[in-house]
């Protein structure tokens, strides 16, 4: 336990059983953190740890005011390519962050910065995929050692409006094409529903099977086919759906489920996480993107307003909806002894970004050559 000033204390938890026991407190903190996303819920993070965590790697920094949890940095220790403290959740989580109670954001951020500075004597603190306005920006602001922020992943966002309102935002010709596609869904008899809590696990497993069928014979994200990913989704989404932090929609054609979509929700954010559909929809000339977004927009519109996030990736098909581009950041923080690790990581990231630009430029030249 370390003193943090102004009545706050910071405790480092490395015990998996203690992490599991934090569920109730954690969800209270999550609800009081304005910037929290679904990827910071206890259900998501603890389930992720059960599937992906490494022995003795857990590093939970817990900020308390008396007995009340007012801040948390869910991190883990990794050794490669350099010693780092990174957020739990890994690459399958679209946003990484800490949690700070809205009534203690300033002092909580300062307390976490102090605790992480001690840890940074031997490890680089590395936050990828930081959404603008995230709580970890408070930690970064109070950091007294070497630090750097880099542009990271791209997300596309739409306002949380019903489909009819989203269509009104589009250019006239494109809006009419979308209306025609929506009308075709009706003529074909495509229906959709949000599944009940007791059906969630079965529906999630059906989603994965349809996702495999959808990508059969094509290049699929390997992790989406691995048992640990399937078990993580089934384990985490059930309690999240029960608490309103997730929703699963099924699409039916002639009484058969032909597609499933998973939405993750928190506050004013609804994120489109993963979907799967049967290839027969292609044979029926169903516009799958329109089908999915029609249901997603209705799910998002029933929330607290805010945004419908298409999450990471700027695939061309997403731009038909005229989304807003949001750039996530990477926040790197070090101490005097780990400053060389920060410099090496920044150089590596810069080199990768430059190489990608060069490759894109060559691809563009070939396309127009």
Which role does the model predict for each range below?
Residues 10-85, 130-153, 161, 168-282:
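A conserved beta-strand-loop-helix scaffold within acyl/acetyltransferase catalytic domains
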Residues 2-8, 12, 137-169, 277, ...:
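Active-site/acyl-donor-binding loops of N-acyltransferases
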Residues 5, 88-92, 184-187:
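Short, flexible turn/loop "capping" segments at secondary-structure junctions
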Residues 56-58, 120-122, 246, 303-305:
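Short, high-confidence coil segments that cap the C-terminus of an alpha-helix
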Residues 117-134:
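ATP-hydrolysis module of ASCE/P-loop NTPase motor domains
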Residues 90-121:
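A gly/proline- and charged-residue-enriched helix-loop-helix capping module
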Residues 64, 107-115, 223-343:
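Aromatic (often tryptophan-rich) hydrophobic motifs at membrane interfaces
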Residues 125-127, 193-194, 307-309:
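Short catalytic-loop micro-motif centered on adjacent basic/acidic residues
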């Amino acid at each position: 336990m370390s003193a943090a000033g102004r009545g706050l204390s910071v405790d480092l938890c490395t015990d998996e059983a203690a992490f599991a026991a934090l569920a109730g407190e954690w969800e209270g903190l999550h609800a009081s953190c304005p910037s929290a996303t679904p990827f910071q819920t206890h259900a998501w993070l603890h389930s992720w740890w059960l599937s992906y965590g490494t022995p003795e790697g857990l590093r939970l920094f817990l900020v308390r005011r008396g007995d009340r949890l007012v801040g948390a940095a869910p991190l883990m220790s990794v050794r490669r390519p350099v010693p780092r403290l990174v957020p739990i959740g890994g690459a399958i989580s679209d946003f990484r962050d800490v949690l700070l109670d809205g009534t203690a954001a300033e002092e909580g951020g300062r307390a976490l910065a102090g605790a992480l500075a001690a840890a940074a004597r031997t490890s680089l603190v590395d936050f990828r995929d930081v959404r603008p306005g995230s709580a970890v920006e408070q930690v970064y602001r109070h950091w007294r050692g070497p630090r750097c922020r880099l542009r990271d992943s791209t997300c596309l966002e739409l306002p949380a409006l019903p489909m009819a309102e989203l269509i009104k935002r589009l250019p006239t010709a494109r809006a009419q094409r979308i209306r025609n596609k929506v009308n075709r869904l009706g003529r074909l008899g495509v229906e959709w529903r949000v599944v009940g809590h007791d059906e969630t696990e079965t529906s999630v497993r059906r989603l994965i099977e349809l996702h495999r069928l959808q990508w059969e014979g094509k290049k699929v994200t390997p992790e989406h086919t691995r048992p640990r990913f399937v078990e993580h989704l089934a384990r985490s989404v059930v309690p999240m759906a029960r608490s309103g932090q997730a929703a699963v929609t099924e699409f039916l054609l002639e009484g058969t489920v032909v597609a499933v979509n998973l939405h993750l929700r928190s506050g004013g954010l609804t994120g489109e996480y993963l979907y799967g559909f049967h290839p027969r929809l292609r044979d029926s000339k169903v516009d799958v993107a329109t089908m999915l977004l029609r249901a997603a927009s209705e799910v998002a519109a029933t929330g607290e307003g805010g945004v419908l996030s298409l999450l990471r990736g700027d695939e061309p098909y997403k731009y038909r909806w005229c989304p807003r581009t949001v750039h996530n950041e990477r926040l790197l923080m070090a101490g005097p002894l780990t400053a060389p690790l920060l410099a090496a990581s920044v150089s590596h990231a810069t080199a990768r970004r430059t190489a990608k630009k060069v490759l894109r430029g060559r691809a563009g030249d070939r396309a127009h050559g």
